[in-house]
Amino acid sequence: IIDVAKMYQDSFFLMYTNGTLIPKDVAQKMEEAGNITPAISVEGMKEETDARRGKGIYDQILAAMKNLREAGVPYGVSVTATRNNVNLLLKDDFYDYYFKELRANYMWMFQFMPIGRKPDVELSLTPEQRIALYKEWVKVLTEKNYFVADFWNSAILSVGCLSCARPAGYFY
């Protein structure tokens, strides 16, 4: 992937990853390419992430973030909001931790959508939780100046995605 990115220096690549394959040498290669930003998937903090992604994964994620910071690679965080983690996502401390302490540059939020072979609607946010989360994001954006983008709901507010040539569309 890094070799492909190097071939297209007129483009910038956002890649989603769990971060487990970003040791120091890979982070350095990303920095040398200069046109890659990884969005590292978490479910919240250590407890939530390890519960969903496997024991020990969160520690590997923290190591990857450290490697990226030290190499000078801008990175972000990708979070799927579910009923299991929404209470955490409604706390300022959650955002402060990732933006201030771990120095993430951006955060993508995805609201869980029950799709696939065995969709579990019980993980979907309630309407009240969606409203509360939206209000938290507005606060985080306007008062803390953290770049948090709600992948689904921002479309309503910004006339859709720029990739569809919508005037004033959002940037994803």
Describe the residue ranges of each PLM region.
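A C-terminal junction/extension of Radical SAM enzymes
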Residues: 112-172
